[in-house]
Amino acid sequence: MWFFNINGNNFYFTFESLDHKPQFFFFFFLLKIICLVTVILCLHEISHAQNYYVSNQRASYKGTNVLSRMEDSVKKQFETQQLTWPPEALYIRSFKYDRQLEVWVKSNRKEPYKLFKTYKVCMQSGTMGPKRMEGDHQVPEGFYQINEFNPNSNYHLSLGLNYPNASDKILSDSIRPGNAIYIHGNCVSTGCIPISDIPMEEVYIIASSVKAKGVDFIPVHVFPVRYNVKKSFDYLNASIKNNQTLLEFNKNIREVFDYFEAKKQLPVILVNKKG
């Protein structure tokens, strides 16, 4: 008796004599053909789904032609910098005091990230320190990921961050921690990261193209300052020198900044019970 389990279903085949071997081998040949066809169809569906995602983003956007033209521009910029389009991975990091947002990409998982471009954050709200409750107008600080693509945002285009993250849920107000934090176009802000319209189109195109390749995790790290810029670091120290909680918080998140600066790779980030 031969036993097989396919997709949770059990199949039993009994052969009374060696005379049944030809049928047995024919069955395996047929099974191989079925598996091969299934794989080809799955790959086709994945490719179709990816193309559909990008097309759907464009179709949903009120300025479809704008996104198409912008994609051509972004492709040329990638080519000029000898970067692979579309990238296999995308990493975004922003610096509050320095008013900058960086876009890093790489063509495969093992290679280090390469900087594509640094954009200006055109409006800033709040002060140094993380967001801790609804209505505090603070831009979050910490480690997030993109969890929403909105081609019809009131702020041109927007990418949502998963605030509150695991740490925020521990350290922020338990009832009203706040929500709806975005990287977006336009130039207004009450706790978000606005980079104006044209830069947002570029970032949105890159992010949606990476998403279309099946990448669900697009990390976004928000730091209070560039720790390796003296003016910025001095400002941070002056702002939080009497706040032990913020001093400890910055010590923790700076470790991730330093790791990336040295290796151009992202470390594994875990959150303990203390946040």
Spell out what each predicted region is:
Residues 16-19:
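Acidic, Ala/Val/Gly-enriched low-complexity intrinsically disordered segments
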Residues 221-223:
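Short internal beta-strands
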Residues 195:
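A conserved hydrophobic position in a structured secondary element of the catalytic/binding core
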Residues 32-42:
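Bacterial N-terminal signal peptides
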Residues 45-49:
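Sec/Tat signal peptide C-region and signal peptidase I cleavage site
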Residues 3, 14, 24-32:
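Hydrophobic alpha-helical signal peptides and transmembrane signal-/tail-anchor segments
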